[in-house]
């Protein structure tokens, strides 16, 4: 059977045994005049085992019935003391019995105040960490709203440690919270619109409206397309003018086509050679334009790159520098083109001035035709005078019929011979005139293919072309003079230097006069 331990009774604890009657005495608290003796009760919610009962505790009563109880602890516990806080209430009907073991007297006393205290929460949190109890005391004073009494801690000597430890803990918490706030503050201005629009940041300065629209509006969109567009317009205008003037007047079309590159007095074949040179120069210029377009993309592609790459301001700045470099290159190309045009015009003008006699221009044709017409008019006048004289002589000799018949026979024979001689001259004239028209017609389409774009060839190549051009001009001029001599020889007859058509008219008049006489 199990033995259960029974609690000792009050008589056993007080060692009061038997049926004895004891006297109960009233204490001094029942005396209304008593002011020195008072009894109070203290109720704890939690009492640690480390309380040192051999030392005295302190009770501090403050205002508004606030009471602070400080109980010392054992030295081995690591916590110097335990602090309780609470309030007190006055008793009205409660009493207590005091039993004296030595004398055996029993005294009844009134209770004055009931004190109910609670252990501070800082002691519970700091006890396992073996830190002094004073370290965490101010932390509990904050949420409770009750300041720590300085009088209770004055005798212990742990007051300064309490304040320093609490300040260290609070400073750590402040640093942690302060660093978080600083990070948030630093993070917000980076994404805020005020920092992006401020002029001090380089990103905002690259996005300013003073740089980008100025280059796009004035320079980039005008300089890039200006070089090919100007040259293409001039080429189309020249080719249209040459093709329109090719059917009517070949000389005027050739003059208008070659007036921009050289003087007006150049011949047709000179303009043909110039057209060939211009074709070669235009092909070279087109190749150079293709290379430049491949090396440097057009402005539209750069704008698309800018639109797709607006996230980085450094890309915009690099693109602007690239645009400036392209514009400088284009200005240099324009200056080189102007210099080449000046050189070409100067060389062509010198060439046209140095060889004015060997060239066969349309004005030279017109002057030759006018001189031939004047010479023919003078010859007609001379022949008219001689015909009048011959007609008078034929009338005087009309009496002789035999001579008239002989003259008729002779005139008929002469007429037949002159008619036989006449067609080769006329055919040669028509053939020569037809050949000149064919030359003009063949020269006009070749001129339409030319252009006045400046050549990028070397100066030596240009001199070689000029030498070949001079040799061709000399050969063609000799050929043309030879044709003129043949034409003049075919026009003038061998008898008296009169043309065949004039002699034919003379013979017809003489035959008519002889018929009238008969």
UniProtKB/Swiss-Prot annotation:
Residues 397-412 have a biased composition (Acidic residues). One of its GO terms (molecular function) is transcription elongation factor activity. The keyword DNA damage does not apply. It is found in: Nucleus. It holds the Pfam family EAF. The modification Phosphoserine is found at residue 192. Its main location: nucleus. Residues 119-216, 241-518 are annotated as: Disordered. Belongs to the EAF family. This is Ell-associated factor Eaf. The lineage of its organism: Eukaryota, Metazoa, Ecdysozoa, Arthropoda, Hexapoda. The gene is Eaf.
């Amino acid at each position: 059977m199990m033995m259960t331990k029974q609690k000792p009774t009050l008589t056993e604890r007080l060692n009061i045994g038997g049926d004895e009657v004891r006297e109960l005495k009233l204490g001094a608290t029942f005396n209304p005049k008593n002011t020195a003796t008072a009894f109070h009760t203290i109720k704890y919610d939690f009492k640690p085992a480390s309380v040192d009962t051999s030392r005295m505790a302190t009770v501090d009563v403050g205002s508004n019935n606030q009471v602070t109880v400080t109980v010392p602890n054992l030295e081995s516990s690591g916590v110097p003391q335990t602090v309780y806080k609470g309030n007190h209430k006055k008793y009205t009907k409660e009493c207590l019995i005091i039993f004296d073991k030595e004398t055996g007297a029993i005294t009844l006393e009134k209770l004055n105040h009931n004190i109910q205290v609670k252990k501070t929460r800082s002691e519970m949190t700091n006890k396992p960490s073996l830190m002094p109890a004073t370290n965490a005391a101010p932390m509990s004073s904050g949420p409770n709203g009750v300041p720590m009494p300085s009088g209770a801690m004055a005798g212990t000597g742990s007051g300064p440690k309490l304040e320093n430890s609490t300040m260290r803990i609070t400073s750590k918490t402040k640093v942690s919270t302060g660093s978080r706030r600083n990070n948030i503050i630093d993070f917000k201005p980076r994404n805020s619109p005020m920092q992006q629009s401020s002029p001090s940041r380089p990103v905002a300065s690259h996005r300013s409206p003073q740089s980008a629209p100025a280059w796009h509006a004035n320079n980039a969109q005008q300089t890039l397309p200006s070089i090919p567009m100007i040259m293409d317009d001039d080429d189309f205008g020249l080719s249209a003018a040459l093709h329109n003037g090719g059917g009517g007047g070949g000389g005027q079309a050739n003059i208008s086509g070659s007036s921009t590159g050289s003087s007006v007095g150049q011949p047709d074949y000179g303009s043909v050679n110039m057209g060939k040179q211009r074709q070669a120069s235009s092909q070279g210029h087109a190749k150079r334009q293709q290379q430049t377009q491949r090396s440097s993309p057009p402005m539209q592609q750069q704008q698309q790159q800018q639109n797709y790459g607006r996230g980085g301001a450094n890309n915009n700045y690099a693109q602007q520098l690239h645009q400036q470099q392209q514009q400088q290159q284009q200005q240099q190309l324009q200056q080189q083109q102007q210099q080449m045009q000046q050189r070409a015009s100067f060389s062509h003008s010198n060439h046209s001035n140095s060889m004015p006699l060997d060239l066969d221009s349309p004005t030279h044709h017109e002057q030759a035709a006018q001189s031939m017409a004047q010479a023919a008019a003078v010859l007609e006048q001379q022949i008219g005078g001689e015909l009048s004289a011959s007609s008078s002589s034929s009338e005087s000799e009309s009496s002789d019929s035999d001579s008239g018949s002989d003259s008729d026979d002779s005139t008929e024979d002469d007429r037949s011979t002159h008619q036989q001689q006449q067609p080769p001259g006329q055919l040669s004239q028509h053939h020569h005139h037809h050949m000149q028209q064919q030359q003009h017609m063949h020269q006009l389409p070749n001129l339409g293919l030319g252009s006045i774009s400046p050549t990028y060839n070397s100066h030596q190549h240009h001199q070689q072309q000029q030498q070949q051009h001079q040799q061709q001009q000399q050969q063609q001029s000799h050929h043309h003079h030879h044709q003129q001599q043949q034409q003049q020889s075919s026009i003038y007859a061998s008898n008296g230097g009169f043309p065949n058509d004039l002699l034919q008219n003379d013979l017809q008049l003489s035959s008519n006069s002889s018929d009238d006489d008969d």
